[in-house]
């Protein structure tokens, strides 16, 4: 499945944004847009539907926070965590993982600005 990933920062400091409108306008099954920088981190919004590939981030932790719908964070070793709206999880650096959404989910991610969304 192709991923539609935009690492460019869409909004500057003090610029208001509507993450819901961005997600609503998304017409592809797997989309990710960097919203803004916060110090050395970046906030991204994603629309997930389907499976991302297994990967890890060697130097950065990654926060996933479900805004709408539900999705799974599958972890190496067989553990799978389901997140529903208003639930989140931090995946520590070095942990092999993938996200999986049987139906459409809208997700906020916060991570170091140096992270590669597709993994190291």
Spans of features found by a protein language model:
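A short, N-terminal "cap"/entry segment at the start of jelly-roll beta-barrel domains
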Residues: 1-44
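Conserved short histidine dyad/triad with adjacent acidic residue
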Residues: 28-29, 42-58
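A cytosolic small-molecule/anion-sensing beta-strand core signal
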Residues: 39, 67-68, 84-85, 103, ...
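Short acidic/polar mixed-charge low-complexity motifs
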Residues: 41-42, 71, 79, 95
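Short beta-strand segments in beta-sandwich/barrel cores
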Residues: 43, 52-54, 69-74, 88-89, ...
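Short, conserved beta-strand element in jelly-roll/cupin
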Residues: 47-48, 57-74, 110
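Short acidic-glycine-tyrosine-enriched beta hairpin
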Residues: 77-93
